[in-house]
Regions:
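Hydrophobic/aromatic-rich alpha-helical bundle segments in the mid-to-C-terminal region
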Residues: 115-122, 134-164
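Helix-turn-helix
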Residues: 14, 18-56, 60
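N-terminal intrinsically disordered/low-complexity leader segments
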Residues: 1-10
Length: 164
């Protein structure tokens, strides 16, 4: 059976999309190949033809997912930034990590990842701070806003009682 010309590109995109959602929901190290290919709707062979290692898949996931977050915050003036932060800190974002920012879910795994993943992550976080600085008008405030927002989501996901 012959595949269409864009088959490999489509399979790669599906693997990154499904891998990002699964990794943010269950953790990257907890995401097995079988679950990943099932969620992506591709064969096991597709993953091995697209990525030389699981670390390479992590790099692709970090780049795609964090780039989306950077894009969501880019060009937002103070009022717009407040709306985006309100969404970021919302119960919906906390309850559905698969559809949100990768930092609260994957930050601790990135800290244990290879140097390439960490450098990629660091560069994208700096871009995120650059984007936040537009709305905060001060770099230190942008870093504080980022840290507090991520911490808020991590805590919201970790505690059982919403009144805590």
């Amino acid at each position: 059976m012959r595949y269409p010309p864009d088959h490999k590109t489509v399979a790669r995109a599906k693997l990154i999309e499904a891998g990002g959602a699964l990794a943010k929901k269950a953790g990257f190290s907890n995401t097995g190949i079988d679950a990943l290919v099932a969620a992506a709707g591709v064969t096991t062979g597709a993953i091995y033809s697209q990525f030389r290692s699981k670390a390479e898949l992590l790099h692709a996931i970090v780049e795609r997912e964090l780039s989306r977050t950077v894009e969501a915050f880019t060009g937002k003036a103070s009022k717009e930034l407040q709306r985006v932060i309100a969404w970021y800190l919302s119960p919906r974002h906390a309850a559905h990590p698969e559809g949100g920012c990768p930092i609260p879910s994957l930050g601790s795994e990135i800290a244990r990842a290879d140097e390439e993943a960490r450098l990629l992550f660091e560069g994208l976080v700096k871009q995120l701070v650059d984007a936040l600085e537009v709305g905060t008008a001060e770099r230190s405030k942008a870093w504080a806003l980022l840290a507090q927002s991520i911490g808020g989501v991590v805590l919201a996901r970790a505690v059982l009682n919403s009144e805590t």
